[in-house]
Amino acid sequence: MASYEQAIGEICSSPYVIRGRITNEQTFLENFRSVTGADSSMTAIEDSNPDNWPISWSNVTAQYAVIEAREPMEVLRHERNQKLAECDKITLKYMSQNLPMPDEWKTYMQTLRDLPENCTPVLEASADIMAMHGKQLTSASVTWPTKPSSE
């Protein structure tokens, strides 16, 4: 799930500290500090003036939107990769016996590999589903290929 802290981490290459959860512009201004150096005891020198910071709230919200936009595809790839990993034992079985891989398995695996280019995944909007199962794709946004029954 996207977070403002993640967005900051992706766009801010300068040293910084976050002292609390960031949920809006006010908490960003209260909790974000740019680190400008260290004093003689090696304690960070923090700048609390937003005018001196390398990022602004608008930078953070723009990156947050980028993260949210890519999440459905990341979930799709994760689920797809799990399904491809399940195919490994089938592939090893045929390879270890010097047997040709059945066409239905080749097609199934290729269809899985092609999914990111062939669909536009959408995450479930239900808070209940997210709380119980984590991020899930809507069934209407992805047509998963049918796993061959023969092994």
Residue ranges with predicted function:
Residues 1-151:
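A preference for well-ordered globular domain cores
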